Amino acid sequence: MTVDRQALGFGYGEHAAYASNPWASRGRLYPEASSPTRSDFQRDRDRIVHTTAFRRLKHKTQVFIAADGDHYRTRLTHTIEVAQIARALARALNLDEDLAEGVALVHDFGHTPFGHTGEDALDEVLKPYGGFDHNAQSLRIVTKLERRYAEFDGLNLTWESLEGLVKHNGPLTTADGQGLRGPVSQPILDYCALHDLELASFASLEAQVAAIADDIAYNTHDIDDGLRAGYLTFEMLEEIPFLARLMYEVRDRYPGLESSRFTHEIMRRQITAMVEDVIGVSQRGLADVRPASARDVRCAGRVIATFSDEMSETDRQIKNLLMTRIYRHPEVMRVREGAASIVTDLYRAFMDDPSLMKEHYWIDQIAGMEEPARARHVGDYLAGMTDTFAISVHRRLFDHTPDLR
């Protein structure tokens, strides 16, 4: 049966000339026939959502250990919030919403259990073998470690989705291949040898809005969680002029508002103000650069979707507040130390005895491997663990208190 794509409207919304065009994608590593009902970027987004890696985000820490309360953000809730903001920005700028959403949904796939603490611990033990980088791990997951399809490993995402995943925070190299922020992780270089992601150029606008959406979501929900946990107070927020103005506005309009509603009214205004700031800056940037294609965006030599100077200063102030009052809070630091020990202990145990990993796939893969390859596979296994699973396995291996396990 023949399907009229334009009548369906799939992927044919109003796109600006500078938007990524799903019907002119640079393709997939393994060629596939197009879908009659979904654009290539829609298929990418759908594949991302149906992965085990996406489901695991539910039990991975954002800032607070997930077991400390059901109302704090996890990697999954953070990812959903980022995707919502990215899609709103993409719609406002006439970009491809599916690509922006897909990049937002996949951007945290490579995070370890226990957030950045777990990543730092895993990077430390893997330093002799190239270290660990969550962005490179995200690429490994979607190009190799997700094993769902009969014809290929990974998800076989489009070039544009993979480019956005790898470069959403900007170019990785100079034109002559020198790393801009240190050496480029080997998994990224290995993939680029097969499917060049052009590491020296900027990413699409869709990837840029996903990146700035990540900042907006972080700034907002970490304040919300910090207030809920008692690490932040409204008085602390008032030290930042931007937040003080929002608080004055809410108090003026809703005098005597209860704390939880007061917090929500501040947060929703913060998101709105930051989103509108990015839209305004992006529109001015587009007027300056005048890109006639997505290629022109990549060659612009600058980020287009970003904060204004004033909002960038607010962003800096908020991040400083979060660092001093939350991320370095004694209780958070105590939990971080324990989390780092769990990752380090498990790595050493699995390297000494791979059979402790239980899953036959991982054990079979490691058999007969040289140490560098074995270390990378153990790193893959550890990075894929959720907080709850890592704690459970560590308790089974290292806590000798008798119980039923």
Swiss-Prot record:
Gene3D superfamilies: Hypothetical protein af1432. PROSITE patterns: HD. GO terms for molecular function: triphosphoric monoester hydrolase activity. Residues 75-219 form the HD domain. SMART domains: HDc. It holds the Pfam family HD_assoc. Keywords: Hydrolase. Belongs to the dGTPase family. Type 2 subfamily. PANTHER family: BIS(5'-NUCLEOSYL)-TETRAPHOSPHATASE, SYMMETRICAL, SLR1885 PROTEIN. HAMAP family: dGTPase_type2. This is Deoxyguanosinetriphosphate triphosphohydrolase-like protein.
